[in-house]
Regions:
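Short, structured motif recognition centered on aromatic/hydrophobic residues
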Residues: 41-48, 64, 84, 91-93, ...
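C-terminal functional regions that serve as terminal interaction/effector modules
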Residues: 22-23, 35, 39, 48, ...
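A cross-kingdom feature marking solvent-exposed beta-strand/loop segments within repeated
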Residues: 68-80, 92, 97-116, 121, ...
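Acidic, Ala/Val/Gly-enriched low-complexity intrinsically disordered segments
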Residues: 2-6
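Short, Lys/Arg-enriched N-terminal segments with co-localized hydrophobic residues
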Residues: 7-17
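Extended catalytic-interface subdomain
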Residues: 112-117, 133, 139-250, 255-257, ...
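Core segments of cupin and vicinal oxygen chelate
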Residues: 17, 36-39, 45-90, 133, ...
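N-terminal beta-strand motif that seeds the catalytic metal site of vicinal oxygen chelate
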Residues: 17-52, 114-117, 179-227, 291-301, ...
Length: 412
């Protein structure tokens, strides 16, 4: 479990076993008989207080296309849901239509946030049964939905907190390739007619391509439990480990272990707080998430960080701020590792983008402010130029920026 994978410097995704769903990845021999072989993140489902209003927020601020819906008019009596897509990122925004529905109750308890990270597999029922044999707790048993267009099978297991991993398998017109291209999502989903922002977003793209990684926050002392869970239940491998010496400031610190699916599909860092003089960002998250673990942020990959951040800022997205003094030394730090940042240095500084490097290349990254009033879920916008790391050289500047925001909120 503690062995690291071998990594390809020229690939966009980590792992010696590469996914064919990612740009520039190299096809390799993989075990097609493994029921837990993951093809892709099928979608990420959010519970929202008002899914229709949230759809406008994500469409305008982040450039998502609002493509399909399911509500009372389509026969959904319990929930209203909207499917948003950008590149190979698919978000479902879902709200409960009755006060006793789980979605409504969880929003009241935890606020808007990620409920489900769904994983595409060949056979959802077989994947579910294997995961249960590996020690997972059931979220719900296999459900098959079929109509004249095809079949979708879903089955879920429980991860940390209230988070589910739903296995999804697709056939017919609901196949993964069709879904990636914006085709039919599943039985009961209808195409959105005129949505005023869709044409605008096509003409003014934000350039977000796919989910690079997805980070969870858990309680003190629970990180290793969930690292072992992902290894034993889903066959993930430990990719990187950061301790309080790596991720600390004068006041706070945390620990993190990064788990990789082994097929280049998804990486899932898991954070826990460490001892510090003040309340860490993980503790703040847990406080405002009713003491319950959950998804802290989604990192969304772009091939053009400067364009994406510029467009997102133009649309009103608020990002964490680092002082201009950060740029006094970052270029030499990256150059000392053997890399010249090709993007315009002045524009990077003007946009407040963070830069880091390792022995495989460099990366550009920036983090949004929380996406809702509670200081919980946020997005990261990341571009990789060979680097397979997570911005270790930026940890101090980043967490000092987070601490400044915590202090403004009265939570440090």
């Amino acid at each position: 479990m503690d062995s690291a994978l071998a990594y390809n410097k020229n690939s966009l995704m980590e792992g010696s076993i590469m996914s064919q769903t990612r740009p520039n990845s190299d096809p390799v021999e993989i075990d097609a008989s493994d029921p837990l072989r993951l093809h892709d993140v099928d979608h990420v489902r959010f519970y929202c207080g008002n899914a229709k209003q949230a759809a406008y927020f994500y469409a305008w601020n982040f450039g998502f296309q609002v493509e399909q819906y399911r509500d009372l008019t389509t026969g959904s009596r319990d929930t209203a849901s909207y499917l948003l897509r950008q590149g190979n990122i698919r978000l479902i925004l879902e709200t409960g239509l009755t006060t006793d529905h789980e979605a409504a109750q969880e929003v009241a308890t935890y606020g808007d946030g990620v409920k489900d990270v769904s994983l595409n597999v060949d056979d959802a029922e077989a994947a579910y049964e294997q995961a249960i044999r590996n020690g997972a707790e059931s979220g719900y048993e296999p459900i098959e939905e079929t109509d004249e267009h095809g079949t979708v099978v879903r089955a879920a297991i429980r991860s940390y907190g209230r988070v589910l991993h739903t296995f999804v398998s697709r056939k017919g017109d609901y196949g993964l390739d069709a879904v990636r291209a914006g085709g039919r999502f599943g039985p009961g989903w209808e195409k959105v007619g005129h949505f005023p922002l869709n044409e605008y977003n096509q003409q003014n793209p934000c350039g977000l391509e796919f989910v690079d990684h997805l980070v969870g926050n858990v309680e003190l002392g629970k990180m290793n439990h969930w690292v072992e869970w992902y290894a034993e239940v889903l066959g993930f491998k430990l990719f990187k480990h950061f301790d309080e010496a790596d991720i600390s400031t004068e006041y706070t610190s945390l620990m993190s272990k990064v788990m990789d699916s082994g097929f280049g599909v998804i990486k899932m860092p898991i954070n826990e707080p460490a001892d510090g003089r003040r309340k860490s960002q993980i503790e703040e998250y847990l406080d405002w998430h009713n003491g319950t673990p959950g998804v802290q942020h989604l990192a969304l990959r772009t091939d053009d960080e400067l364009h994406s951040v510029h467009e997102l800022r133009r649309r009103g997205v608020n990002f964490l701020k680092v002082p201009q003094s950060y740029y006094d030394e970052v270029w030499e730090r990256v150059k000392a590792l053997g890399w010249d940042v090709k993007e315009d240095h002045e524009k990077i500084a003007d946009l407040g983008i963070l830069v880091d490097a390792d022995d495989e290349g460099y990366l550009l990254q920036l983090f949004t402010q929380p996406l809702q009033d509670r200081p919980t879920l946020f997005f990261e916008i990341i571009s990789r130029r060979g680097s397979q790391s997570f911005g270790k050289g930026n940890f101090k500047a980043l967490f000092e920026a987070i601490e400044r925001e915590q202090a403004r909120r009265g939570n440090l």
